[in-house]
Amino acid sequence: MSQFSFTKMHGLGNSYIYVNMFEEQIPEEDLALVAEKVSNINTGIGADGMILICPSDVAPVKMRMFNNDGSEGKSCGNGLRCVAKYAYEHKLVEDTVFTIETLAGIVTAEVTVEEGKVTLAKIDMGAPRLTRAEIPMLGEGETPFIRENFLYNNHRYAFTAVSMGNPHAVIFVDDVEQAPLTTLGPVLETHEMFPERVNVEFIEILNEEEMNFRVWERGSGVTQACGTGACAAVVASILNGKMERGKEITVHLAGGDLMIAWTEEGNVLMKGPAEVICHGVYEYKIEA
């Protein structure tokens, strides 16, 4: 029987099991199965996945994110805010501004601290990737995919593809509560046009500075929030002429609000909370 200490945290209800790999050890070959086991709501702790906070050669810390199906993702906006909170509060970093390595690249985090606790985290998510090759999706490599039609159940849905280090398909609807989240979501996620699968977002524009948001996450299904998805939604809204670049947009997710801005300089900034749920020790056994 093996075990490790963990902290369960969430960003707007998007919860992960966080493991401090400066102190803990999980064999590389076990990571996918451990992520699946610990995320199980009935036989594990229950979460949207597992995130490792690791040493890095190029930043103070490195984030590795695993979905609850065991697949490894390249980035996670809500996860990054929680990693920023954990790293500062556990003295893995000293400054309130620092970098985090991800499989999608290095991002910059800035934390707001009150009485020694991080109350808010802002992440510079970098520039969005808009070509098919960068997303990635099939088709002409250098061509963006903006408001193209997808036929499902005799209804045409127009979506825009954006990568924020992970792929997103953003669909505008009149009412997110009536969107085909659990039906169209998994169909698009696994469609052959996306060789690495895709996250699917449904967006309802409220005004020039607010939107409602619902998400079907690649490898996890319906979740309360998706930080990279919120960033992709704002970028897609601007590309489609629905919102203005440079303004801070409030994205209303099922779990709460994020503030997102696609700056004139090109990067996307995400600001929101990160909270600790509990600490504990998880025991597991890998069958031979």
Curated annotation (Swiss-Prot):
Its main location: cytoplasm. The record marks 168, 217 as: Could be important to modulate the pK values of the two catalytic cysteine residues. InterPro entries: DAP_epimerase_AS (IPR018510), DAP_epimerase_DapF (IPR001653). One of its GO terms (molecular function) is diaminopimelate epimerase activity. The active site is at residues 76, 226. The keyword Isomerase applies. Substrate binds at residues 14, 67, 77-78, 166, 199, 217-218, 227-228. Its EC number is 5.1.1.7. Pathway: Amino-acid biosynthesis; L-lysine biosynthesis via DAP pathway; DL-2,6-diaminopimelate from LL-2,6-diaminopimelate: step 1/1. The keyword Isomerase applies. GO terms for cellular component: cytosol. GO terms for biological process: lysine biosynthetic process via diaminopimelate. Keywords: Amino-acid biosynthesis, Cytoplasm, Isomerase, Lysine biosynthesis. Disulfide bonds: none annotated. It comes from the Bacteria. It catalyses: (2S,6S)-2,6-diaminopimelate = meso-2,6-diaminopimelate. PANTHER family: DIAMINOPIMELATE EPIMERASE, DIAMINOPIMELATE EPIMERASE, CHLOROPLASTIC. Homodimer. NCBIfam families: DapF (TIGR00652). Catalyzes the stereoinversion of LL-2,6-diaminopimelate (L,L-DAP) to meso-diaminopimelate (meso-DAP), a precursor of L-lysine and an essential component of the bacterial peptidoglycan. Belongs to the diaminopimelate epimerase family. This is Diaminopimelate epimerase. It comes from Bacillus cereus (strain AH187). The lineage of its organism: Bacteria, Bacillati, Bacillota, Bacilli, Bacillales. The gene is dapF.
